Amino acid sequence: MADRGGVGEAAAVGASPASVPGLNPTLGWRERLRAGLAGTGASLWFVAGLGLLYALRIPLRLCENLAAVTVFLNSLTPKFYVALTGTSSLISGLIFIFEWWYFHKHGTSFIEQVSVSHLQPLMGGTESSISEPGSPSRNRENETSRQNLSECKVWRNPLNLFRGAEYRRYTWVTGKEPLTYYDMNLSAQDHQTFFTCDTDFLRPSDTVMQKAWRERNPPARIKAAYQALELNNDCATAYVLLAEEEATTIVDAERLFKQALKAGETIYRQSQQCQHQSPQHEAQLRRDTNVLVYIKRRLAMCARKLGRIREAVKIMRDLMKEFPPLTMLNIHENLLESLLELQAYPDVQAVLAKYDDISLPKSAAICYTAALLKTRTVSEKFSPETASRRGLSTAEINAVEAIHRAVEFNPHVPKYLLEMKSLILPPEHILKRGDSEAIAYAFFHLQHWKRIEGALNLLQCTWEGTFRMIPYPLEKGHLFYPYPSCTETADRELLPTFHHVSVYPKKELPLFIHFTAGFCSSTAMIAILTHQFPEIMGIFAKAVLGLWCPQPWASSGFEENTQDLKSEDLGLSSG
């Protein structure tokens, strides 16, 4: 019965809209009629306009007006056509400059966008845009949209900085805002997810903090945190907010996080004892677990920044053992960076063996750290001249393949590691395979690549070879899925405006822009040469017409126009 029911549902989904109960059976022919009328509307208007002109030809004196226009056109001199050509070239050049600026800023042609969005429906292009609810085209559109959403998923930066002690100090020094509103809004949503639950109304301090996480103004959030501490001196989330946003040094932030840890552990033990009483208590335990893990992780990051790296590694290992389900927080990336700072490369390899798995999501930290370890074994003795003369060894081939794998996953990282682009403070959220992830990785890992002698040299010699293996990265990848086309838009939302977002693959100018540029330039050049050297250009044009139009009437007519141009030019010169 279950299988039979499943087949019935599949048949109902694949059936046409008219055969599915509950759908309007007249929807299909109405849409088709509307599309047909839209397609023939332009032709009907054209025929009606011709008929109206024929009926009004005598009252409007169309014949006399047409004769006057003909006389006016015949009286125009060649100088007028030269000036007209120059003016049209100037206008076309201005249009080209605007088109180039629009394409450079928005990544699309303005004329093409207007044509597709506004002119195509008027020219009868609405039929192709109408698809039935169960048609394959509609299914493909839905599948593509779901794929784009999954590709453009934004992740919280595992190594994000402290707002008060790092981001705000940067603003004080440079006057620039390193975080965008979109990035901070995502952080506010994360805080509400991690630090709030349905039982917050039971404790007044949690109610105040629930409002504080939704507050946009930083001073108002800090004020709300102090109000929560007045109501409950053991409010862990209030200490977390103060450590993140009010503390101006890492030492102050660590002190507040230690107070938060003391309060968070007490609340966590109480929640563990009551977790089986009701679903609300289970939700409260999940919230208190998130708070405790967040506090310990930030304490580990404080210890890492203050030079107590072994202490930071111990805290991270304990977290990963105590809360293994929370791998989504990517604590292993914090651990990898700390182990690299200790130069504990065997431990780094052990972590990679666990997390660089085909079933787990990849990241720039995973791929580039794996490439760094393989590069480390050969980079010291690597020489491009020697390699080209004797060929690559097995270890060198493995290192080059690891670099190609990492570059395919995120092609923006090498420019930052090789210092071809300047680094900025990483955002609080990153887009995997995007420029934001590249900045976040290079900001913390550049020193580890510099520490290994020859690693950057090997990277510089081999990273561009990746692009020969994936000539069409948006359509087909080599080791990963095709590169998502939505990274540029998402990165522009995550990164500040003063940063030049890296784009991959490089967008080429449309053929229309190249054609417009060539046409405008050549027309303007011909107009200038004709104005300055009428005799030479006349001989050149006569030769061209002789090649393409060998009829005698064409050359004789052109000679008359050339003689008129010469006589008028002489008359102007003598005057």
UniProtKB/Swiss-Prot annotation:
Keywords: Membrane, Transmembrane, Transmembrane helix. Residues 125-147 are annotated as: Disordered. Residues 126-137 have a biased composition (Polar residues). Belongs to the ST7 family. The keyword Transmembrane applies. One of its GO terms (biological process) is negative regulation of cell growth. The chain crosses the membrane at residues 36-56, 80-100. The keyword Repressor does not apply. Its main location: membrane. It is a multi-pass membrane protein. This is Suppressor of tumorigenicity 7 protein-like. GO terms for cellular component: membrane. It is found in: Membrane. It comes from Homo sapiens (Human). InterPro entries: ST7, TPR-like_helical_dom_sf. PANTHER family: SUPPRESSION OF TUMORIGENICITY 7, SUPPRESSOR OF TUMORIGENICITY 7 PROTEIN-LIKE. The gene is ST7L.
